Amino acid sequence: MEAKAILRDTPTSPRKMRLVAGLVRGKPVDLAKAILLNSTKAASRNVMMTLKSAVANYAQRNPDERVSDQELFVKTIFVDEGTTLKRTLPAPMGRAFRIRKRSNHLTIVIDKVKNPVTK
């Protein structure tokens, strides 16, 4: 049974967040956490927070099942564009340049590995 966590209106551009999301797509949760901890991208903190929330949601939905991070994997992760705040910057000769402050919505779905690999 899968679990989902959504982080809405994150003040980061979707393009920057998608770079970090691509790092953990399809990976086991313990490996994804290690990747995010060692990432230098600012968006990795938000992805880590949402991933931990998804793991907690999985534990909440399956109270009688005890699973570790090795048995869970990131099934899907995607970044949608959120609201865009439009600001103006004064420019020469009485003009104004438009600044678009973008935001995004991050969705992470985790699930249990069907056939876990044992070492």
UniProtKB/Swiss-Prot annotation:
Pfam families: Ribosomal_L22
Listed GO CC annotations: cytosolic large ribosomal subunit
CDD domains: Ribosomal_L22
GO molecular function: rRNA binding; structural constituent of ribosome
One of the protein's GO biological processes: translation
Record-linked Gene3D superfamilies: Ribosomal protein L22/L17 (3.90.470.10)
Keywords attached to this entry: Ribonucleoprotein, Ribosomal protein, RNA-binding, rRNA-binding
Coiled-coil positions: none
Assembly notes: Part of the 50S ribosomal subunit.
Protein family according to the UniProt entry: Belongs to the universal ribosomal protein uL22 family.
Purpose: This protein binds specifically to 23S rRNA; its binding is stimulated by other ribosomal proteins, e.g. L4, L17, and L20. It is important during the early stages of 50S assembly. It makes multiple contacts with different domains of the 23S rRNA in the assembled 50S subunit and ribosome. The globular domain of the protein is located near the polypeptide exit tunnel on the outside of the subunit, while an extended beta-hairpin is found that lines the wall of the exit tunnel in the center of the 70S ribosome.
Protein name: Large ribosomal subunit protein uL22
Organism name: Pelodictyon phaeoclathratiforme (strain DSM 5477 / BU-1)
